[in-house]
Amino acid sequence: MTARALDELVEPGWAKALEPVADQVTAMGQFLRAELAAGRKYLPAGPNVLRAFTFPFDQVRILIVGQDPYPTPGHAVGLSFSVAPDVRPLPRSLSNIFQEYADDLGYPMPACGDLTPWAQRGVMLLNRVLTVRPSNPASHRGKGWEAVTECAIRALAARSQPMVAILWGRDASTLKSMLAGGDCASIESPHPSPLSASRGFFGSRPFSRANELLTGRGADPIDWRLP
């Protein structure tokens, strides 16, 4: 991640929302450059580290929080759970998300794992930690990203417009206290990982339930369809 001002890296609405942690974003850029200088790579690639914040802040109606990026080289693209269109096979968690998507909404299974269309339609796909060392899960937890993403979540919740947070797993559920205030509802279930999907993720209908909560608050539903 190059040393640039926050408003050059993210969408204008997000630049304002993240202003309280601008110095922390700068510090994280310094951390990543130090990692590279020490011969340690990170994922996703530099231009994608803040990708979740390049979509309009004011248009977010759904928040889906992941833990940290996929540690498999070639998988992480800066949006939680999403992968590049050419990635095969899909990560198991994403395959389970797509199975629930098909069961919940009746749509065919998507042709690839690229969730960019969701992000373009108002779904914030945010990892709690925005980078990871390749093949080393959770390696950048506790390095400082949590302050940045906590600020982002609180800023979303503080708006007066409706939003639904989809919280998958225990780690995501701990964020519920940050969502207090504003007009934010939440949906909780086990994580879609193979270890927990059969314990309540399958059958939880997060996509249709989120749209019901949005329309009940006078907001437009999300078009969840993927190619």
UniProtKB/Swiss-Prot annotation:
It catalyses: Hydrolyzes single-stranded DNA or mismatched double-stranded DNA and polynucleotides, releasing free uracil. SMART domains: UDG (SM00986), UreE_C (SM00987). This is Uracil-DNA glycosylase. One of its GO terms (molecular function) is uracil DNA N-glycosylase activity. GO terms for cellular component: cytoplasm. One of its GO terms (biological process) is base-excision repair, AP site formation via deaminated base removal. CDD domains: UDG-F1-like (cd10027). The keyword Hydrolase applies. It comes from the Bacteria. It holds the Pfam family UDG. It is an enzyme of class 3 (hydrolase). Its EC number is 3.2.2.27. The active site is at D68. Disulfide bonds: none annotated. It is found in: Cytoplasm. Coiled coil: none annotated. Excises uracil residues from the DNA which can arise as a result of misincorporation of dUMP residues by DNA polymerase or due to deamination of cytosine. Its main location: cytoplasm. Belongs to the uracil-DNA glycosylase (UDG) superfamily. UNG family. Keywords: Cytoplasm, DNA damage, DNA repair, Hydrolase. SUPFAM superfamilies: Uracil-DNA glycosylase-like. The gene is ung.
